[in-house]
């Protein structure tokens, strides 16, 4: 299940900080800028909402971290989640199977970044698209959601991140009127 919130600047941050775990509060307050604090808190609140609505869990979630830094829920190894944020939105995905999500703002297309992160087939798709900026972000969110699902994070070879794409199921949602795209990745089967 996916939860999205676009109201990053529309809540009382001080009050929200009292609704999160001490672990998350400390993490949020390490951000230098308020927007970072807000997205950190809002992502956690979305996770709390998802856990309550999907699994009946009302306690504040506490995280433990895997080998590559991917968070997992303490006491609930059967529940998988992933969080992401961009300037326009915060996203949370929860499942009983490993899951990854990435949300990104649609910005100015940069051919240099594309050449560094995309393989030849992906570059052709972008070049042939009516909106290269959208095509690039669509592919980027797929790569990042896949890498977040496996816990790898951004790797040295981003060009190969989708080489095994047949193994994964991607769901991409384009909210172009709101200037963002998100992709959810789950393993097929």
What are these regions (language model features)?
Residues 1-189:
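Core catalytic alpha/beta fold that binds nucleotide/phospho-ligands
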